[in-house]
């Protein structure tokens, strides 16, 4: 061990800094043991004066399905912590009652503590967007032991696919836990100070923060019990949404299934297209022309030569034939999806995985080109297999996987255009598996490596209760649009007109126009290329469609 790795420095503002041994002399683990109060009322006043839009990071409405983990500190094996949702809420449906016990038996030089920790992976919060601070509702009582410590967890060296807890920045409030009644705590980002890092001068970089901790610290080293109520941890921004442009849908997805083929009520495609044109929608994107999910043995057009399901297994439900005939009669445009395949998430670094998908798409593209290359309504190709920017359960963040994906997209697009030279579309899902700026860089690298893809419609994920439309989407749209422009790909948005939630459980349903309107408003500030997923939840007679009809007519 070098002298550098043994270094112990006295740091007056924070107490002792200890440099712990790490893998190299460049990566020194700096650890401040002191507990200085960091409350700054002037900074709090500034946040309050400039706060505009906010985002809920954690609502504490439900104990089950939560994203955070409760535990005792590594040095606090005799302490205890538990929590449950209670109806005594300041916002929303519930609040979290945190019960804790101190035994005054720390096994290190640090005080005993209990903690709640949340690490962001997919669907993450990005604190760098018009940043001011955090807010948190807290209800304490005068008998509570301990002080409040909020930590931001950062990796200044974060790379796609890799994030490590390299830095902690702490905010300390020594009185809030003893205050009776609900108190709204404002925590300016400038009140966070380095607690642990790689170097004494590490700075808070909000774009590299990927989680937080809420600690209760036994500063006085006394035994005791307490209860604290928490509600509505929020990201506070200075961003004020302004919808200067009035957006319109120009196209819409349709997911084919046997119901549309077997039920006569769905035969009148001419009427559907006519109704769509009345509200400015003149294009449909058929998500896939073969298979998908439980209906993987179906070709949705006649004359299919698909053979990978086995002889006599593949069947035909030629809805596309009817759609193309109706489109020609009504002057409608159809973009045809290819094979309804999916990536093998366990083999994303294996070229053979992509070769199999390519071979199947070549068969489908060949079939469709023979039937529709000269059809006046055939407007383009859509590569059906859906990719994303996600971190887990598997994705393409690492360079080798990203390059295999870009090579695959290039091969499919190039082959399709060789059969019929029409524009090629893709529609990746925005899973927010990286901070917004890094996500934009990742899309930029992918698209610059990809040839013959003309349009990218970004799925907004607004139908899955996983995104804040006002905060998350503007942040990511800005960076990803820039990536598209620099790569020569046209940027569009794919708005989800459905809604469902895993937790709390909400069954799949169509959105109302009131729910859908803001998604459209946000997207329209970044592009005129706005599509809708999908016809199943946005069709004549539905509130979403009829509300949009009224909105569209009001723009004339």
Locations of regions flagged by a protein language model:
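C-terminal motif of bacterial Sec signal peptides marking the signal peptidase cleavage site
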Residues: 19-22
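Active-site groove signature of glycoside hydrolases
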Residues: 340-341, 364-399, 531
């Amino acid at each position: 061990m070098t002298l550098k790795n043994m270094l112990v420095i006295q740091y007056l503002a924070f107490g002792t800094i200890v440099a712990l041994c790490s893998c190299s002399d460049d990566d020194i683990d700096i650890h401040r043991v002191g507990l200085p109060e960091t409350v700054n009322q002037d900074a709090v006043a500034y946040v309050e004066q400039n706060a505009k839009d906010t985002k809920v990071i954690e609502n504490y409405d439900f104990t089950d399905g939560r994203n955070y983990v409760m535990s005792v500190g590594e040095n606090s094996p005799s302490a205890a912590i538990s929590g449950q949702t209670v109806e005594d809420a300041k916002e929303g449906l519930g609040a979290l009652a945190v019960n804790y016990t101190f035994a005054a038996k720390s096994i290190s030089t640090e005080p005993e503590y209990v903690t709640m920790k949340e690490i962001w992976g997919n669907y993450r919060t990005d604190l760098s967007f018009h940043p001011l601070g955090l807010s948190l509702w807290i209800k304490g009582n005068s008998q509570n032991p301990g002080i409040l410590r909020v930590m931001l967890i950062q990796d200044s060296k974060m790379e796609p696919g890799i994030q490590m807890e390299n830095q902690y920045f702490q905010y300390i409030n020594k009185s809030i836990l003893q205050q009776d009644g609900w108190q709204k705590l404002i925590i300016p980002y400038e009140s966070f100070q380095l607690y642990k890092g790689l170097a004494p001068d590490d700075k808070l970089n909000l774009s590299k923060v990927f989680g937080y901790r809420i600690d209760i610290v036994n500063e006085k080293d006394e035994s005791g019990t307490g209860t604290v109520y928490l509600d509505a941890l929020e990201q506070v921004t200075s961003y004020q949404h302004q919808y200067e442009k009035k957006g319109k849908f120009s196209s819409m997805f349709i997911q084919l299934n046997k119901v549309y083929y077997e039920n006569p009520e769905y035969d009148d495609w001419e009427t559907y297209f006519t109704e769509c044109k009345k509200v400015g929608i003149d294009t449909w994107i058929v998500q896939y022309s073969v298979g998908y999910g439980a209906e993987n043995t179906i070709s949705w057009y006649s004359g299919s030569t698909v053979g990978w399901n086995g002889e006599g297994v593949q069947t035909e439900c030629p809805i596309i034939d009817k759609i193309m005939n109706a489109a020609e009669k009504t002057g409608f445009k159809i973009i045809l999806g290819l094979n309804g395949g999916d990536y093998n998430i366990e083999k994303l670094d294996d070229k053979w995985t992509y070769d199999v998908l390519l071979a199947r798409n070549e068969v489908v593209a060949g079939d469709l080109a023979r039937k529709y290359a000269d059809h006046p309504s055939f407007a383009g190709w859509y590569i059906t297999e859906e990719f994303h920017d996600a971190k887990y359960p598997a994705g393409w963040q690492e360079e080798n996987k990203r390059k295999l994906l870009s090579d695959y997209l290039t091969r499919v697009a190039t082959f399709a255009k060789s059969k019929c030279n029409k524009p090629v579309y893709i529609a990746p899902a925005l899973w927010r598996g990286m901070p917004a700026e890094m996500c934009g860089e990742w899309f930029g690298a992918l698209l610059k490596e990809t040839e013959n893809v003309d349009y990218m419609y970004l799925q907004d994920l607004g139908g899955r209760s996983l995104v804040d439309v006002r905060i998350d989407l503007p942040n990511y749209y800005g960076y990803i649009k820039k990536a598209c422009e620099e790569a020569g790909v046209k940027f569009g948005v794919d708005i989800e007109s459905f809604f469902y939630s895993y937790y709390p459980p909400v069954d799949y349903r169509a959105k109302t126009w009131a729910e859908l309107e803001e998604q459209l408003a946000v997207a329209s500030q970044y592009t005129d290329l706005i599509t809708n997923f999908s016809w199943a939840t946005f069709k004549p007679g539905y509130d979403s469609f009829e509300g949009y009809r009224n909105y569209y007519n009001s723009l004339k």
